[in-house]
Amino acid sequence: MNNSVTNTARLLWAGLRSLLVLTVVTGVLYPLAVTGVAQGLFSDQANGSEIKADGKVVGSSLIGQAYNLPLKKGQETPEPDLKWFQGRPANGLGTNSVNTQYSLILSGATNRSGDNADLIKWVKDAKAAVVKDNSTADHKVKPSDVPADAVTSSGSGLDPDISPEYADLQVHRIAEQNHLAVAPVQKLVDEHTDGRTLGFIGEPRVNVLELNIALKELVATS
């Protein structure tokens, strides 16, 4: 009997020691080590790839933002604020009442096929809107000028980047809306165009948030 109790106590004590050791290693030491390495070597990425303006965090370089006008009475979908560069559309994501700046809870693409009537209508309507919104008194946009990313959402619906072609398409409208010359606005786009990663991965791109921060500074100094 005594041996049975002793063996049981020994096993319980061994199990408790294992629990304590594993708790310290996996619950304290390992997280601290990973956090230390992340902060030491990849501080920017570990903190969410934050973008700051005037000393304040205004967003992440990994998540797109919407630049829309306030909803008017009776409207279900806000109109784009044409003073700012616009990102890719987010068709099919819907809306949520928890986070209105980013549709994070509803991220994802639609499941509609390429020949779906609703999707075809979305693309046609989006192209017509891009042509209308970006045509100015002295610069007319043709449907053939509209790049694919201007009328299609990304896989997540939260793409922070647009193609240089789509950014270039918006230059004349941005200049007109903000009472700027075209040349400095085009220069902003050129300065914020990133090439392919490592020279061969992906496509050239423009981060919309970073571009709009630079645009805000340009407007303030003009």
From Swiss-Prot:
GO terms for molecular function: ATP binding; P-type potassium transmembrane transporter activity. One of its GO terms (cellular component) is plasma membrane. Residues 136-162 are annotated as: Disordered. Keywords: ATP-binding, Cell membrane, Ion transport, Membrane, Nucleotide-binding, Potassium, Potassium transport, Transmembrane, Transmembrane helix, Transport. It is a single-pass membrane protein. NCBIfam families: kdpC (TIGR00681), PRK13994.1 (NF010599). Belongs to the KdpC family. PANTHER family: POTASSIUM-TRANSPORTING ATPASE C CHAIN (PTHR30042), POTASSIUM-TRANSPORTING ATPASE KDPC SUBUNIT (PTHR30042:SF2). Part of the high-affinity ATP-driven potassium transport (or Kdp) system, which catalyzes the hydrolysis of ATP coupled with the electrogenic transport of potassium into the cytoplasm. This subunit acts as a catalytic chaperone that increases the ATP-binding affinity of the ATP-hydrolyzing subunit KdpB by the formation of a transient KdpB/KdpC/ATP ternary complex. This is Potassium-transporting ATPase KdpC subunit.
